Amino acid sequence: MPSNNSSFLDIDDDLEGVDDFGNEPNPFDDATVPDSPNMNNSTAGKGSEFYNTTGSKAESAPLQGQMDPPAYDQVIGQNDNDGLGRNGLRPGLINYYSKYFQIDLTQFKKRLSAVLTFRNDHNSESNEDNTDLYGAVWITATVVMINFTMSRGLNFIISDVIEGVKTGEDIDRASQFKKLLHSIWLFYGYTFGVPFITMQVLNRDEHSERNRSFKSVPELISVYGYANLIWIPVCVILNILDMSKRLRTVQAIQWAIVALGWAQSSYFLNSQISSNNNTETQSNGKFSLSIIVVVALHTLFCLLFRFIIF
């Protein structure tokens, strides 16, 4: 009789609910849950066996992917066995030109001092290709920024600081940005454009033995870039004199300073392009066609610098 009552209560209402799963077995009844080693019950034996097994594996083998952190001076991702150095970077345009910006500070200072002291040390360290474009980019950028900020800075110091007169409304911003644009195209165009012409002239010169053998155009660009170091003090002096440029005496001094910069930079270019062992040519006073073309282009550059910027 009780069984009939239980079957009478088992009514399917065609709705999904808890009563639909009342007669189904519990899937967790047959699951074996291991006990922790510290549990004091009858099932602790099997549980302790499970934990002892996993614990021994964890102690003997480290976690997958676990490694010590890199040292303080270690470059992440660097592999000492890949054989890739300054001349062995992986293919790619950025990697190709990035080697020209890997320069030692001592070597950079040595090249800067060689320009100012008329020494021929720029490319005489060794036969290894130590060409850099770092100097060509940043020395030229320094010259451009001096031409852009020097005049305004001097006016601010003299008028606003010393005399105490505000001259903010009298600034000729059009002439300042005009000088900036002219400095950019003139110096960067000369530094990175003329070496392509010079390279072609050097390759076609009949007296090529008088000239140094350049392996690539970036090597010539590096020479022209370091030659711009001479124009840093020249531009500083010219900007100071430019405040009184109406006087004829000041204009004559500006011409003399530009001529001095031309002479020193021309000498540096000549010393770098000419062969170091060419003592016979230097004693006879003869110059190759390449040197004549280089000096002529440099003279044109100095004239444009004098008339356009100052």
Curated annotation (Swiss-Prot):
It is found in: Membrane. Keywords: Membrane, Phosphoprotein, Transmembrane, Transmembrane helix. The gene is YIP5. Residues 10-22 have a biased composition (Acidic residues). The keyword Coiled coil does not apply. Residues 1-84 are annotated as: Disordered. The modification Phosphoserine is found at S60. The chain crosses the membrane at residues 131-151, 181-201, 220-240, 249-269, 290-310. GO terms for molecular function: small GTPase binding. Pfam families: Yip1. It comes from Saccharomyces cerevisiae (strain ATCC 204508 / S288c) (Baker's yeast). InterPro entries: Yip1_dom, Yip5/YIPF1/YIPF2. Possible role in vesicle-mediated transport. May be involved in proper membrane localization of Rab GTPases. One of its GO terms (biological process) is vesicle-mediated transport. One of its GO terms (cellular component) is membrane. It is a multi-pass membrane protein. Residues 35-57 have a biased composition (Polar residues). Interacts with SNX3, TVP18, TVP23, YIP1 and YIP4. Interacts with SEC4; The C-terminal cysteines in the Rab GTPase SEC4 are essential for the interaction. Interacts with YPT1, YPT6, YPT7, YPT10, YPT11, YPT31, YPT32 and YPT52; These proteins are all Rab GTPases. Present with 937 molecules/cell in log phase SD medium. Belongs to the YIP1 family. This is Protein YIP5. Its main location: membrane.
